[in-house]
Amino acid sequence: MGGILFIDEAYTFSKGGTDFGQEAIDTILKAMEDNRENFVVIVAGYPEPMEEFLNSNPGLKSRFNKNILFEDYSPDELLQIFNSFCRSNDMKLSDDAVQYLKDYLAHLCQNKPDNFANGREMRNLFEKALSNQANRLAQIVDISDDALNEIKIEDLENAH
């Protein structure tokens, strides 16, 4: 056996006290020990639950002894992510929507909720804005191509 196993939100194995979770942890630990030369396990998740996960079993902390903490994205980076969703969907932001989004992202980054989702937050915001845009345009009889491809400020205001 060899390769790389990536487990996102690994702490779900240790929550709830299920036998399945403990069995999965035991199996992973055994595979790591038996295949040290050619098997890598990477676990990922939010910092606090990951710390609890690593402390849930004496073998975990010693086997996962390298930690990399990825900082949250800045408002500018989040804007770039949102814009990439726009480009991928042939959409654009109106000028006032750009400024609104910049202000919203600055506020969001200063008041982050626990377990802030970064890129996923931008995907969700984009999808809600698209839904809002579709609802707004459904009330218009004659819709231009530009209107179909533009997210306006009101689409964003109701998206978060």
Spell out what each predicted region is.
Residues G2, I7, Y11-I42, E48-K61:
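Conserved catalytic/switch belt of AAA+ P-loop NTPases
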Residues I25-L29, E51, N83, R123-F126, ...:
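Short, well-ordered alpha-helical packing segments
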Residues P49-N55, F70-N115, A134-V141:
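Conserved C-terminal "switch" segment of AAA+ ATPases
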Residues L93, L108-H160:
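C-terminal helical "lid" subdomain and adjoining coupling/linker elements of P-loop NTPases
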